[in-house]
A protein has these predicted regions:
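Hydrophobic faces of well-ordered beta-strands that scaffold small-molecule active sites
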Residues: 94-102, 132-133, 161-163, 203-207, ...
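Surface-exposed cleft-lining segments at the edges of enzyme active sites
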Residues: 131-138, 177-182, 212-223, 247-254, ...
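N-terminal carbohydrate-binding/catalytic regions of secreted carbohydrate-active enzymes
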Residues: 91-193, 197, 357, 361, ...
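N-terminal low-complexity, Pro/Thr-rich disordered segments
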Residues: 20-119, 176
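Substrate-binding cleft of extracellular glycoside hydrolase catalytic domains
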Residues: 149-246, 262-264, 275
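Hydrophobic alpha-helical membrane-insertion segments, chiefly the h-region
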Residues: 9-19
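Surface-exposed substrate-engagement region within the catalytic domains
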Residues: 108, 112-126, 255-374
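N-terminal export and membrane-targeting signals
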Residues: 1-7
Length: 381
């Protein structure tokens, strides 16, 4: 999801993602990283003003490797389920606090190192804050139970979990985060199973990072098929749980122009209340919050759709904005951004989220996707 003006870099946003895994089929979730690279999304300081933050770098994130996507053959036309009728505008969830999933690498480290001098800082500033749970492995047989383990945990505490389905075919354009379902028919089935685990409580779904912003690596026909599957996915998720809030990929402020991104989002169903509650941006990146706020509002304006559509922003590592030069791999000098919250105080901004868990390496300060305490401490202190 790292892209510069006219150059899209085939690097995924999911470096160091946490996947809820559980091979026992019983839904026991263990947050575990996928060994993938995430594109750099730059975090922005959260300011009530939509104007760009002066500290934010406009430089797009650099490419780790410009790898041409090797898209799979276009799938044959398929029947798509999911209602297309309009739904009433969403309302604010009854739950007002985000859910902290009890299993993650950072929590494991904190529990295992009570005497480490960095433990208090890492525990209080990272481990104790809610972060998204990623589902990046294509495992149809267990996906329902694993999603249910997270959503039921949130419901039991009266809190809102954040889940990230990340299994679209040809994800990351065949780059470092490649993987996902073998084809769109299989993906549609996987999403049906994912939706079956959402339950009936409040939940935020960050639907397929990179899937829209990075779609220009696909031929036009395959891009249209992907967008049709994403639109269907949004409808299926919201049909399964009317309290689910589904957000679509808007890239980040250093990537596509708002009008271009909005055009693709519209094709993917993001302008319809039947499938969408809005957009997300800055996943795994570092762009300043103020820049993302301004960008997201511009995208929403260009997108049209119901006035209820809003944006959620990944603020996990954007406390100092993006580094000069567009470095994306564990750049020095970055800090934690705004704490996760559903109360931003900003119009059209529904939440600040930690979609990327701070301290999980992009691959330069530790193995890709693994929790690295020295990196976490640098971000948090």
């Amino acid at each position: 999801m790292v892209a510069a003006a006219s150059v899209v870099v085939a690097v995924g946003t999911a470096t160091g993602i946490l996947s809820a895994l559980g091979d026992d089929g019983g839904g026991a979730d263990e947050a575990r990283p996928e060994v993938t690279r995430s594109p750099r999304l730059e975090s922005l300081p959260v300011l009530p003003s939509p104007s760009p933050s002066p500290s934010a770098s406009a430089t797009p994130s650099p490419s780790a490797s410009v790898k041409k996507a090797s898209p799979s053959p276009s799938p044959k036309p398929r029947k798509r389920s999911g209602k297309s009728g309009q739904e009433a505008p969403r309302t604010t969830p009854a739950a007002t606090r985000l859910y902290l999933h009890p299993r993650s690498q950072v929590l494991d480290w904190v529990r295992a190192h009570p005497d480490d001098p960095r433990q208090d800082v890492i525990a209080s500033r990272i481990a104790d804050r809610p972060a998204a749970v990623w589902f990046a492995d294509y495992t149809p047989a267990t996906i329902t139970s694993r999603v249910r383990a997270v959503t039921s945990g949130g419901a039991a505490e009266g809190r809102v979990p954040v889940v990230v389905p990340y299994a679209i075919p040809d994800r990351d354009c065949g780059g470092h985060s490649q993987g996902g379902a073998p084809d769109l028919d299989a993906y549609d089935d996987w999403i049906d199973r994912f939706a079956a685990g959402l339950g009936s409580g409040d939940v935020i779904v960050v639907l397929e990072p990179d899937s829209v912003a990075q779609a220009d690596c696909l031929p036009a026909g395959e891009r249209a098929d992907r967008f049709a599957s994403l639109s269907r996915a949004g409808r299926v998720l919201k049909d399964a749980n009317p309290n689910a809030r589904v957000y679509f990929d808007a890239g980040h402020s250093g990537w596509h122009a708002p009008a271009k991104q909005a055009g693709w989002l519209k094709q993917a169903g993001a302008a319809s209340a039947a499938s969408s509650d809005g957009i997300f941006s800055n996943v795994s990146n570092f762009h300043a919050t103020a820049d993302e706020v301004a960008y997201d509002r511009a995208v929403l304006d260009a997108l049209g759709g119901p006035a209820s559509l809003g944006a959620v922003i990944d603020t996990s590592r954007n406390g100092n904005g993006a580094p000069s030069g567009g470095e994306w791999c564990d750049p020095d000098g970055r800090k934690l951004g705004r704490a996760p919250t559903l109360s931003t105080g900003l119009g059209r901004v529904d939440a600040f989220l930690w979609v990327k868990l701070p301290g999980e390496s992009d691959g330069c300060k530790g193995k890709p996707g693994t929790f690295t305490p020295s990196y976490a401490y640098d971000l948090a202190r």
